[in-house]
Amino acid sequence: MKTIILATLIAMPAIATEIKEVRLLTLDPGHFHASLVQKKMYPQVNPVVHVYAPGGPELDQHLKRIEIFNTRPDNPTHWQEKVYTGPDFFEKMIAERAGNVVVISGNNAKKAKYILACIQAGLNVLADKPMAITPADFRLLEKAFIEARNRGLFLYDIMTERYEITTILQRALSRHATVFGRMEDGSPDNPAITKESVHYYCKEVAGKPLTRPPWFYDVKQQGEGIVDVTTHLVDLIQWECFPDQAFHPREVTMLEARRWATPITVAEFKKPTGFDHFPDYLKPSVDKNNVLQVYCNGAFIYTIRGVHAKISVEWKHEAQPGTGDTHYSMMRGTKAALVIRQGKDQNFKPILYVEKRTRLSDAEFERALRIAIGKITQDWPGIDTKKCASGWEVVVPDQYKVGHEAHFSQVTEKYLEYLATGKMTEWEVPNMLTKYSTIMRAYKLSR
């Protein structure tokens, strides 16, 4: 039965009633990503936003961020937040129906239930990742997609990394066979695709130190590392390596998966949370030395349509001054490897490199690369290359380096486009299902 349902979702494009004016509902905004959706105004979106939450510091921080956007000197927003707080906040939102799109970014333990209930109530949903953190959540998510299809609604997760310029260019160059060749199949010991990221609990958002809720350290509420940031990395593998293609979960084979913990002391816990002790719900994860063991790290190797891919996510307490979250991405073709590095040599900014793997001379290869870059500049004027020790560095003008926070607006604009036309790109829904199916297989294999 499940195979039939998935096949139907893949075969039928997502179609909904066109929405010309979007009225946002913000549900229990426990994560700062909820505010980043509102970092700019959108012509299609009503400036009045109804917020439903239980109240408390997480809501206060969300409203403070919106106020910062509203009062900044350059291009301020003009959102009007209408807030309801109380234990019945979710029921109140459903009863009032003050909007037609729900933004969900908060405690992940509740997210899949919220998503399904919102869809069943006839509301479109724009959800932060991950939409599911356990196999039970994934079953709810499958139901939500089926309900959305039946009701003519759009459910979409916020995949910001598709809008990072180095990722866009890596994808674009891989489509030029004269430079990249064809994608290699790789092996478990030498995958053809590698996506790795390192994140930090302590960092700045919108120029201010980020406050984390204590539950962010609870994998039962935030999710383990193997099901969280991995959503971005699996999504990019599908989006970059197989552009505009729909997947079915049966095209994925999970080979190996593991998880491991990051130790967090009370002092480290206090810095982003303000708490000088571990809450009771974290006590089962505290060792005999009073150190919290957070299973926020995960890695797995799998095949997708026969191509071997490796995913790895790590979380650490705090980055060194001047550094931050980092990303490494490698796609290996028969003629070249396309590699994004973001380490010390790159001043912790992502840079794309083209590394020759063919017997062509450097001069011959560079001619082919120049032709490919010339075609890419039709969409991205100013892109260039320069020779470097490992091959060629792709030079990106500053105008395209908009930063991670701006990507939330870009995702929102894409979602608004889907709502305005009443049509979603036909591969989006099946690929979201395949993505979460892949991650859940890794989760189960890592136990």
Please name every model-derived segment.
Residues P57, A109-A112, L116, R139, ...:
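A structural signal for well-ordered alpha-helical segments within the folded catalytic domains
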Residues G207-G324:
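Rossmann-like dinucleotide-binding domain that binds NAD(P)(H)
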Residues G122, D128-P130:
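Short helix/strand-capping hinge loops at secondary-structure junctions
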Residues T17-L123, A136-L155, E417-A420:
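N-terminal glycine-/serine-/threonine-rich beta1-alpha1-beta2 phosphate-ribose binding loop
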Residues A7-A16:
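Hydrophobic h-region of N-terminal signal peptides that target proteins for export
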Residues M1-A7:
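Sec-dependent signal peptide recognition
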Residues D228, L233-Q238, Q245, P249-R250, ...:
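C-terminal helical cap and adjacent loop that interface with cofactors, partners, or active-site loops
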Residues A132-P209, G223:
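A contiguous active-site-proximal alpha/beta segment in oxidoreductase catalytic domains
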